[in-house]
């Protein structure tokens, strides 16, 4: 049953297969075929008055449809307003508004629909694009490709919209036997029955007044028996059909219809009431052409199915099957498609879900878009109301500069004897070092790759108030000043003014939070009694801004455990520090309950010439900033380090160790071998095994290690 409203979206001034309500004001009417569900309002008084008051409104249809319509006296008033258009012949039509005189020309082409005699499809072409209205149609697969008027040259015309017959647009009706297959099955049944005797009669139980003429003609031609029908009026001008039908009831094939219902003549199954003249009873079988019944079957059936003692069902369809609809639409490939009929038990949403993937508009909207991922450095904050067209990643922002979070306080100039080598300092307390992560831009060999999911950014503020959480890795380009360190260790600032810039332990290592309660401090052994792991790192050029790579990010870091260690009570922690091209190398130590011994060695000029400004970590010994305090003094103070010895660049510094966590001490036991390989410094010599054994043995015993350098290397 058609549910088409009668108006095309592209050409609303036309009315097709619907002639009531707003359609009455249309400038032209079109009728695809003479079935009642497509003729609503066609003989209504309102439309009749509209025709009487208009001189230009016409009804366009095929010649067969015109003959079928005018054979019914109820539509006789249309005789002067019907224009028959030749099938497959493009025709120019002028649409004139009788009120304003506005005129629009469109081209319409009638294409065979294969639904019933006279049924056509309308192809409209005009300023608003090409539109195809199928009405009811039955086209076999590949038949659309054979229609020349659907093509422009060798390609299919650019069709904007298709108003489609979707009666069987349901997977249940995926395949419907073709008319030839149905005809073959019916023909065999009728032949086998009628040849038994002249009293064996077949009744074709057809529900429509017309539409089965294809079946009648072929049965008559094959068997030589005319088909009995109720009326011949509608076919009087169609001799090709009229020759195969008759009103004579004494024939073996009947297609007559009951006036009201199937029980019109009880005891006789023929609606016409024919009986044998000599009293011999007739043997009648009924064949009901149907499609819906076969679609409801679960199992595959034959074209002809026996449903009773003398009743049969024959699969015979006037509408395209599901697969035929898909074939037609995939070949036409319109921009839009609109269903004219809803399948039994279906909905418009389900039908559109099936049809839309075959439309070009759907393909354009769902075509995958390949976009570059962009910079994967951090999550981009976006408004939640952004549409789906937004990119997943921010490709417009440049790399975020690595700057310290707190720069409110200006760094104080270093009050040392060498102001030309002084660096800018960041005045931060130890708690600030624990709670915050400061970022700085690196100038050498820095792999800047942060992958963030907004968790790190959100946790920055929370870390300021929660000392129990782990701190993020710190990469600092500046050194903390002496005043800040002195205040953290309880030493007055006036005692520290003579000290040079002091690098903080947190500048090089990730700090793990330690509970500073007195209870924990009592449980920790002093660093003087405890043995620790060694850490090797190198400083960059003292003239330029220092650049560092944190131990957790550096690929050159490794862990070295002490050889011959005797446990906690045997030795002190030793840290080996290497400085490149630094002019001042003096040390002062501040302890808080314990001490460590640190060895600082100065690289030779040959080593400083290498373009390696990264820190080489030879052991990871995380601690808080308040645990390690170092002062760098002038080079002249080196000479007073040891009496009777040559000037050295390797010194021992005691480093406070008051808050080592048990977890960190337990980890040292497992560091029995190097975890990574340390790349050699350019132009450096590989130390011999016996020298390394001797060096480690002295380090394990807590003894000072001095390296004599030749005068030319100073």
From Swiss-Prot:
Q: Where is the composition biased (Low complexity)?
A: 544-561
Tell me the segments the record calls region Disordered: 391-500, 516-577, 598-617, 638-683
In its keyword annotation, does this UniProt entry include Iron-sulfur? no
Q: Name one GO cellular component term.
A: nucleus
Q: Show the InterPro entries listed in the entry.
A: DRMBL, Metallo-B-lactamas, RibonucZ/Hydroxyglut_hydro
Residue spans with biased composition (Acidic residues)? 447-468
EC assignment: 3.1.-.-
Q: Which domain of life is it from?
A: Eukaryota
| Residue ranges with Basic and acidic residues bias | 603-615, 660-670
Its subcellular locations are:
Nucleus
**What does the record give as the function of this protein?**
Required for V(D)J recombination, the process by which exons encoding the antigen-binding domains of immunoglobulins and T-cell receptor proteins are assembled from individual V, (D), and J gene segments. V(D)J recombination is initiated by the lymphoid specific RAG endonuclease complex, which generates site specific DNA double strand breaks (DSBs). These DSBs present two types of DNA end structures: hairpin sealed coding ends and phosphorylated blunt signal ends.
Kindly provide the name given to this protein in its UniProt entry: Protein artemis
Q: What is the lineage of its organism?
A: Eukaryota, Metazoa, Chordata, Craniata, Vertebrata
Question: Gene that codes for this?
Answer: DCLRE1C
């Amino acid at each position: 049953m058609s549910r088409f409203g009668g108006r095309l979206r592209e050409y609303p001034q036309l009315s097709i297969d619907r002639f009531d309500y707003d359609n009455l004001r249309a400038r032209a009417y079109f009728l695809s075929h003479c079935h009642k569900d497509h003729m609503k309002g066609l003989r209504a008084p309102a439309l009749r008055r509209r025709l009487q008051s208009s001189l230009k409104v016409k009804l366009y249809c095929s010649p067969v449809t015109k003959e079928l319509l005018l054979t019914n006296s109820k539509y006789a008033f249309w005789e002067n307003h019907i224009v028959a258009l030749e099938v497959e012949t493009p025709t120019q039509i002028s649409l004139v508004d009788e009120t304003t005189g506005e005129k629009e020309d469109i081209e319409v082409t009638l294409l065979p629909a294969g639904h019933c005699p006279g049924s056509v499809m309308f192809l409209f072409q005009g300023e608003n694009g090409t539109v195809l209205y199928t009405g009811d149609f039955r086209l076999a697969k590949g038949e659309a490709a054979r229609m020349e008027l659907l093509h422009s040259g060798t390609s299919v015309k650019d069709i904007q919209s298709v108003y489609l017959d979707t009666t069987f647009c349901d997977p249940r009706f995926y395949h419907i036997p073709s008319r030839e297959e149905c005809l073959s099955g019916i023909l065999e049944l009728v032949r086998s029955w009628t040849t038994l005797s002249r009293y064996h009669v077949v009744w074709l139980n057809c529900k429509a007044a017309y539409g089965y003429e294809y079946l009648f003609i072929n049965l008559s031609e094959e068997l030589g028996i005319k088909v009995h029908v109720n009326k011949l009026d509608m076919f009087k001008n169609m001799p090709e059909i009229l020759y195969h039908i008759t009103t004579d009831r004494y024939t073996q094939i009947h297609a007559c219809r009951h006036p009201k219902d199937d029980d019109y003549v009880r005891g006789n199954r023929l609606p016409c009431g024919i009986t044998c003249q000599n009293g011999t009873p007739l043997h009648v079988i009924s064949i009901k052409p149907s499609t819906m019944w076969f679609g409801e079957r679960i199992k595959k059936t034959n074209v002809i199915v026996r449903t009773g003692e003398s009743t049969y069902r024959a699969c015979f369809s006037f509408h395209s099957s599901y697969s035929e609809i898909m074939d037609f639409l995939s070949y036409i490939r319109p921009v839009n498609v609109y269903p004219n009929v809803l399948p039994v038990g279906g909905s418009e949403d389900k039908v559109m879900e099936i049809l839309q993937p075959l439309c070009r508009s759907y393909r354009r909207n769902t075509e995958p878009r390949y976009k570059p991922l962009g910079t994967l450095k951090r999550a981009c904050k976006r408004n939640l109301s952004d549409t789906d067209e937004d990119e997943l990643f921010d490709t417009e922002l440049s790399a975020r500069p690595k700057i310290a979070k707190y720069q409110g306080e200006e760094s104080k100039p270093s009050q040392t004897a060498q102001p030309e080598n002084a660096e800018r300092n960041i005045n931060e307390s130890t708690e600030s070092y624990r709670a915050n992560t400061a970022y700085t831009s690196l100038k050498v060999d820095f792999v800047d790759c942060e992958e963030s999911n907004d968790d790190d950014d959100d946790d920055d503020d929370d870390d300021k108030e929660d000392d129990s959480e782990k701190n993020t890795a710190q990469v600092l380009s500046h050194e903390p000043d002496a005043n800040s360190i002195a205040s953290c260790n309880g030493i007055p600032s006036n005692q520290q003014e003579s000290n040079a810039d002091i690098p903080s332990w947190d500048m090089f290592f990730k700090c793990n939070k330690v509970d500073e309660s007195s209870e924990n401090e009592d449980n920790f052994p002093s660093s003087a009694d405890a043995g620790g792991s060694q850490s090797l790192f190198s400083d960059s050029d003292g003239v330029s801004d220092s650049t560092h790579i944190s131990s957790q990010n550096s690929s050159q870091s490794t862990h070295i455990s002490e050889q011959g260690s005797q446990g906690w009570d045997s030795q002190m922690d030793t840290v080996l520090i290497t400085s490149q091209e630094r002019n001042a190398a003096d040390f002062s130590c501040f302890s808080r309950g314990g001490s460590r011994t640190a060895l600082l060695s100065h690289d030779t000029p040959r080593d400083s010439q290498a373009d390696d400004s990264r820190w080489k970590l030879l052991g990871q010994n995380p601690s808080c900033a308040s645990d390690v305090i170092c002062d760098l003094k002038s080079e002249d103070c080196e000479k007073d380090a040891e009496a009777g010895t040559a000037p050295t660049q390797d010194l021992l510094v005691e480093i406070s160790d008051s808050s080592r966590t048990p977890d960190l001490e337990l980890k040292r036991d497992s560091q029995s071998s190097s975890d990574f390989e340390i790349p050699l410094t350019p132009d450096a010599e590989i130390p011999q095994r016996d020298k390394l054994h001797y060096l480690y043995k002295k380090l394990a015993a807590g003894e000072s290690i001095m390296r004599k350098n030749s005068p030319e290397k100073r």
